[in-house]
Curated annotation (Swiss-Prot):
Organism field: Pseudoalteromonas translucida (strain TAC 125)
Alphabetic keyword roster: Aminoacyl-tRNA synthetase, ATP-binding, Coiled coil, Cytoplasm, Ligase, Nucleotide-binding, Protein biosynthesis
List of residues binding ATP: 554
Enzyme Commission designation: 6.1.1.9
Catalytic activity: tRNA(Val) + L-valine + ATP = L-valyl-tRNA(Val) + AMP + diphosphate
Residue interval(s) of motif 'KMSKS' region: 551-555
Official protein name in the record: Valine--tRNA ligase
Length: 951
């Protein structure tokens, strides 16, 4: 094996070999186990969230594969409607100076397919870099032929069951992209704005209790007053009780609107009077329905003012009454209209006052423009009938959330479901399978031929297909079963559905998880006709944040690319990556400064295994993770530790008799028996942690055993045997070295696939295992074997460790060289202590550098000593000639002074109220850690000083 571990030399060639040899495919043997990857956007590239979730999924997949399950990790990508269309539109404009309208729908869609063929595979290439053991031969795309058929089938069936309908309702409208968007694509931003207090004149000479002929409404959106249908007051608000049912003469448009009583108006907020605009506000829309108010749309698709308000009944039917808009406002952008309307109110003497006001403004996450609630004709799914079985599936335990607390989030959404708007005004996506005749009649079917056949429509009648496409989440909701061949009842569907676990983020529990549950329960039944769930467990991950706890985003310039941590990146390239193509270039200077400070030397290459192990080790259930480059560095060192330990094993076993192929006698040392027992305990804990989705505890278990038990202790304890033992003892230790390392590599493999495969290929033949044309990933996962745990050996070796540590502590405290042989005096020795010393003399002599043991009948006979204890056994080392007391006290005093100075500085900082109130949490945590460190150092140094002074 090479002297140093270099992941770049092994990773990519290994992966290619695994894929070519078909190791990722289901074996066809054993209990089925399946995971469906959340399909990443085809436009996307790997980010830390992907790396985190993919590490968890691959760990589970490899774990179950090695346990003998018939394992499928289903891979695929999402067509990502808006994201893909925008990307190709930008490319088209940059390269050819054209818009999609210049090309026309068909040619533009062909352009997107061309782009997908050329560039759409970026994320799948990156998935390979992570070591993802997905079955690439089964890769799906949400717009491939099979999935497109499934989407049409679901739409047609739901429509026949009256669960899909077309209606005029309020949606999040993006005036730049000209499409409805989902709540998830809306980014709410806190902004400083204004609250305009407007006077609305009362009609018919009506007066308020205090004699005014108007009431005052407060609004942050004066422009929408053109579409007002009423004013609401609280039914318990005595100021306005006499006005309920009376009318207002709406300024500028001179339209009469009613005053209604509704709980939506808060009598303690503002003036207590709320203008109601059902066509341009979601809350107002609900009030409007309750009072059967008309809906008056005042905006076109660009959010500019119409020439005439479009009027509809509260349930979306066209109305015949006029809602005129003054010509001077026609065609004005909504924000220009706002200024014009406020100016008119001021001119009319109807502007009461303007107040500064903080408000939350919805922006399109891709277009960056303010989203407008707009009345449009859209297709909807009736969610309520689908939601009840979906709630029951979680209540009765058919689906479990890990951590369980996310069930509450799920239920809070499911108890307040609204009908789902599934149409989008885009060209890229699943086109809605509905056709219209010239009179506007709508027909739904799988294709035009079916529509004509089922509705007896002659070929001479012109039909035109709906221009809209389906929400991307609609096809994603069918992911677990459409990927397995539905609507056909395929063997894959019977074998791998329901899937075992879904790994996802909390932010899409409603948008994706709940919809998958609803759709799957509705369409998929088992052999007994019982509705099937899409997955048995939902494992919910937190977000990965930067080291200060801030969300990673391009605008903050704190995004970390997983591949940069795997391969490394130079500082200049990193700066360019973080500051190039920014939406807000003015932030670039600060981002560059911060990047140069934090990553002065760029980012070193750490390899895939170190990244995966870090992600697993930080995966405490459901909590957000503050990324820590130091931990990544630490786990890169862990890979080195494993590599070097394996080299030690190979150097001491290759071309030696390791006792696997012969009947020659093997004698296991106490250390051999101990490490075998320790390994079994590790197998037990690690397996339990993975079964319970505690990847953090599983990683920690591996780390503790590998670094502290196997490397720090066992390898050291083998040296006396390998250098001085007889043949049987050496054979026993070599056999144990190989047995434990080979088994440990199999245990580690699910989390760290590359390094374990590389070492296993060298180690396994020494254990008599065949490695030609096979891989560690298809070997058996270690199973806990209680018979291999020798309790007496475990106790005895732990005692030996404590004894050695006691000697090392004395050396450390007294600054005695580790290589200096010592004489040891022992008092209060039990018969077990005596036995253990006699049986393990070679270990103690070698690892603690002890040349002589003396048992004392009376410890008062001992000269001046430094002492320590193992249980009741007192271990004493005579100090005469070992240390210079004065020099040692001088050294300790210097260290003490340094610790006290550091302690005082931190205490002063934490006593500063301004610092504590303004510092980020991560900074405070670091200061508190320093406080504990300096306090601890001071305590230990004072103890040390007292000991030396007592000599």
């Amino acid at each position: 094996m090479d002297k140093t571990y270099n992941p770049q030399d092994i990773e990519q060639s290994l992966y290619q070999g695994w894929e070519e040899k078909g190791y990722f495919k289901p074996s066809g043997q054993g209990v089925p186990y399946s995971i469906m990857i959340p399909p990443p956007n085809v436009t996307g590239s790997l980010h830390m969230g992907h790396a985190f979730q993919d590490t968890i999924m691959d760990t589970l997949t490899r774990f179950k594969r090695m346990q003998g399950n018939n394992t499928l990790w289903q891979v695929g990508t999402d067509h990502a409607g808006i994201a893909t269309q925008m990307l190709v539109e930008r490319k088209l404009h940059a390269e050819e100076g054209k818009t999609r309208h210049d090309l026309g729908r068909e040619d533009f869609i062909n352009k997107i397919w061309e782009w997908k063929k050329e560039s759409g595979g970026t994320i799948t290439k990156q998935l390979r870099r992570l070591g993802a053991s997905v079955d690439w031969d089964r890769e799906r795309f949400t717009m491939d032929d099979g999935l497109s058929e499934a989407v049409k089938e679901v739409f047609v069936r739901l429509h026949k069951e009256n669960l899909i309908y077309r209606g005029k309702r309020l949606v999040n409208w993006d005036p730049k992209l000209h499409t409805a968007i989902s709540d998830l694509e809306v980014e709410n931003k806190d902004k400083q704005g204004h609250m305009w207090n407007l006077r609305y004149p009362l009609a018919d000479g009506v007066k308020t209790q205090d004699g005014k002929d108007y009431i005052v409404v407060a609004t942050t959106r004066p422009e929408t007053m053109l579409g007002d249908s009423g004013v609401a007051v609280n039914p318990d608000d005595e100021r306005y009780i006499d006005l309920i049912g009376k009318e207002i003469l709406l300024p500028i448009v001179n339209r009469r609107i009613k005053i209604v009583a509704d709980e939506h108006a808060d009598k303690d907020k503002g003036t207590g009077c709320v203008k109601i605009t059902p066509a341009h506000d979601f809350n107002d829309n609900e009030v409007g329905k309750r009072h059967k108010m008309p809906m008056i749309n005042i905006f076109d698709k660009d959010a500019a003012i119409l020439t005439q308000g479009e009027t509809y009944s509260f349930d979306g039917k066209e109305l015949e009454f006029d809602a005129p808009i003054p010509e001077r406002l026609h065609g004005l952008d909504r924000f220009a209209a706002r200024k014009a309307i406020v100016a008119e109110f001021e001119e009319l003497g109807l502007l009461e006052k303007i107040e500064d006001h903080g408000l939350t403004v919805p922006y399109g996450d891709r277009s960056g423009v303010v989203i407008e609630p707009l009345l449009t004709d859209q297709w909807y799914v009736r969610v309520a009938p689908l939601a009840e079985p979906a709630k029951e599936a979680v209540k009765n335990g058919d689906i479990q959330f890990v951590p369980k607390q996310y069930e509450n989030m799920y239920f809070s959404w499911m108890n307040d479901v609204q009908d789902w708007c599934i149409s989008r005004q885009l060209w890229w996506g699943h086109r809605i399978p509905a056709w219209y005749d010239s009179e506007g009649n709508v027909f739904v079917g799988r294709d035009e031929a079916e529509v004509r056949r089922e509705n007896n429509i002659a070929d001479s009648v012109t039909l035109s297909q709906d221009e809209d496409v389906l929400d991307t989440w609609f096809s994603s909701a069918l992911w677990t079963f459409s990927t397995q061949g539905w609507p056909a009842n395929t063997d894959d569907l019977k074998t791998f559905h329901p899937s075992d676990v879904l790994v996802t983020g909390f932010d899409i529990i409603f948008f994706w998880v709940a919809r998958m549950i609803m759709m799957t329960l509705h369409f998929i039944k088992d052999e007994n006709g019982k509705p099937q769930v899409p997955f048995k467990t939902v494992y919910v991950t937190g977000l990965i944040r930067d080291d200060n706890g801030d969300k990673m985003s391009k605008s903050k310039g704190n995004v970390l690319d997983p591949l940069d941590m795997i391969d490394g990146i130079e500082l200049e390239e990193l700066v360019q990556k973080r500051t190039g193509n920014m939406m807000q270039p003015k932030l670039a200077a600060k981002i560059e400064k911060d990047t140069r400070k934090v990553f002065a030397g760029g980012i070193e290459a750490h390899g895939t295994d170190a990244l995966r192990f870090t992600l697993a080790a930080m995966a405490s259930t459901g909590r957000d993770i503050n990324w820590d480059m130091n931990r990544l560095e630490g786990y890169r060192n862990f890979c080195n530790k494993l590599w070097n330990a394996s080299r030690y094993v190979l150097m001491n076993t290759e071309e030696q008799d390791c006792g696997f192929a012969t009947d020659a006698q093997k004698e296991l040392s106490l250390a051999d028996r101990w490490i075998l027992g320790q390994f079994e305990s590790t197998v037990k804990s690690y397996t339990e942690h993975l079964d319970n989705y505690r990847f953090d505890l599983a990683a920690n278990t591996l780390y503790e055993f590998t670094w502290h038990q196997f490397c720090d202790w066992y390898l050291e304890l083998t040296k006396p045997v390998l250098f001085k033992g007889n043949e049987a003892q050496q054979r026993g230790t070599r056999n144990t070295l190989i047995t434990v390392l080979e088994s440990l590599l199999r245990l580690m493999h699910p989390m760290m696939p590359y390094i374990t495969e590389t070492i296993w290929q060298r180690v396994a033949p020494l254990a008599g295992l065949e490695t030609e044309n096979t891989s560690i990933m298809v070997q058996a996962f270690p199973v806990y074997n209680a018979a291999s745990v020798d309790a007496k050996a475990m106790d005895d070796l732990e005692w030996v460790k404590q004894f050695i540590l006691a000697i090392r502590n004395i050396r450390g405290e007294m600054d005695i060289s580790p290589s200096k042989p010592l004489s040891v005096l022992l008092a209060n020795a039990s018969s077990d202590d005596v036995r253990r010393i006699e049986e393990n003399n070679s270990f103690l002599a070698s690892l603690a550098k002890i040349e002589e043991f003396t048992m004392l009948e009376n410890k008062d006979d001992a000269p001046a000593c430094a002492a320590s204890y193992v249980g009741n056994l007192e271990i004493m080392i005579p100090m005469a000639g070992l240390i210079d007391v004065e020099a040692e006290l001088s050294r300790i005093n210097k260290q003490l002074e340094k610790a006290e100075k550091g302690l005082a500085q931190v205490q002063n900082k934490l006593a500063n109220e301004k610092f504590v109130n303004n510092a980020p949490e991560a900074v405070l945590a670091k200061e508190n850690a320093k406080l504990a460190e300096f306090s601890d150092a001071k305590t230990k140094l004072l103890e040390q000083k007292a000991k030396i002074e007592s000599l």
